[in-house]
């Protein structure tokens, strides 16, 4: 019964997770392209895509969702934003906007 309940909720959580990633990627690329930073937009897309795949398969939060712990569903969906990917993403944005132009 627990397995069935979790299999019902898992697709909606994964769809929400993927849609958050895609919407942010599209928005940031739109800003970068309109500011004529085509190379930065391409590098950002590639970097963000790799980080998303890494987070999806290796993040402890995602593993806990897939391990069928029903009481963890709501917390896991909220805790996705606390993944190490966010820290790397912020670092990458700072590097692109501050350090990269000075090189």
From Swiss-Prot:
Keywords: Membrane, Transmembrane, Transmembrane helix
Lipid bilayer topology: Multi-pass membrane protein
GO cellular component term of the entry, any: membrane
Transmembrane regions: 9-33, 40-57
Membrane is among the record's keywords: yes
Expression induction or repression: By the zinc-responsive transcription factor ZAP1 in response to zinc deficiency and by mild heat stress.
Subcellular location(s) per record: Membrane
Functional description taken from the UniProt entry: Identified in a screen for mutants with decreased levels of rDNA transcription.
Protein name: Regulator of rDNA transcription protein 1
Species: Saccharomyces cerevisiae (strain ATCC 204508 / S288c)
Taxon lineage: Eukaryota, Fungi, Dikarya, Ascomycota, Saccharomycotina
Gene behind the chain: RRT1
